[in-house]
A protein has these predicted regions:
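Alpha/beta-hydrolase-fold catalytic nucleophile elbow
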Residues: 155, 180-181
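Extracellular/periplasmic Venus flytrap/periplasmic-binding protein
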Residues: 57-58, 65-172
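Beta-alpha junction/loop-to-helix N-cap segments that form part of ligand/metal-binding clefts
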Residues: 1-61, 70, 130-137, 157-163, ...
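Short active-site oxyanion
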Residues: 23-26, 149-152, 174-177
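Cofactor-binding loop segments of dinucleotide-utilizing enzymes, especially the Rossmann-like FAD-
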Residues: 3, 101, 180
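Short hydrophobic/aromatic-enriched beta-strand-loop microsegments
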Residues: 46-53, 121-125, 173-180
Length: 181
């Protein structure tokens, strides 16, 4: 079946797979949004769902008994970048520039970075919101050149990451550490 990357359709198909096709377990869909839509259905029927592509922290705070993940939640994806930068800086806090898309996954990554900044005594110098269809990061990168952070963190999925890498090179942005999803 094709969920068409539509959460409502994914939930309907989960219902069909369980109630009509009599599946005994499910492999989760791609993305946190689709997993969020399907999890209540699998819970309702007590059908285990093993997922490898839904990393939003909110999936793991709902108390689901039948949802199992094989990856870390999104808030833990890039916090190690901040901790590593601090370690390389002799244990002293670092300046962090952040730019995140406004989807659930990227916002969970952002929360993990904010936690790491606080935990390490680091400083947030840029906290930009990126559009869903990221085509241009120039405004953020101009600020990065001005503020000279120790770390730049970007969460914009494949297209956003490719855009960031291309524009960082084109604009000759020099940042000691770059971390991306």
């Amino acid at each position: 079946y094709d969920d068409e990357s539509n959460p409502k359709r994914a939930a309907q198909l989960a219902e069909r797979l369980i109630s009509q096709d009599k599946v005994e377990f499910m492999l989760g869909p791609y993305s946190s949004g689709l997993t969020k839509a399907m999890a209540p259905v699998t819970e309702k029927y007590g059908v285990p769902m093993v997922e490898a592509n839904g990393a939003s922290r909110s999936l793991f705070t709902k108390g689901y008994k039948y949802l199992f993940a094989v990856l870390a939640p999104a808030n833990l994806y890039l916090d190690v970048a901040i901790k590593t930068a601090v370690e390389l800086n002799g244990g002293k806090g670092v300046k962090v520039a952040m730019a995140f898309e406004q989807d659930a996954f990227s916002q969970d990554v952002r929360l993990g970075i904010l936690d790491a900044i606080k935990e390490t005594g680091s400083t947030k110098v840029i906290d930009d919101k990126l559009p869903k269809e990221l085509n241009d990061m120039a405004a953020t990168l101009v600020k990065v050149k001005q503020m000279k952070p120790d770390v730049l963190v970007v969460s914009g999925h494949t297209k956003g990451a490719l855009t960031a890498i291309r524009q960082i090179a084109e604009m000759k942005v020099d940042v000691p550490m770059l971390a991306m999803t």
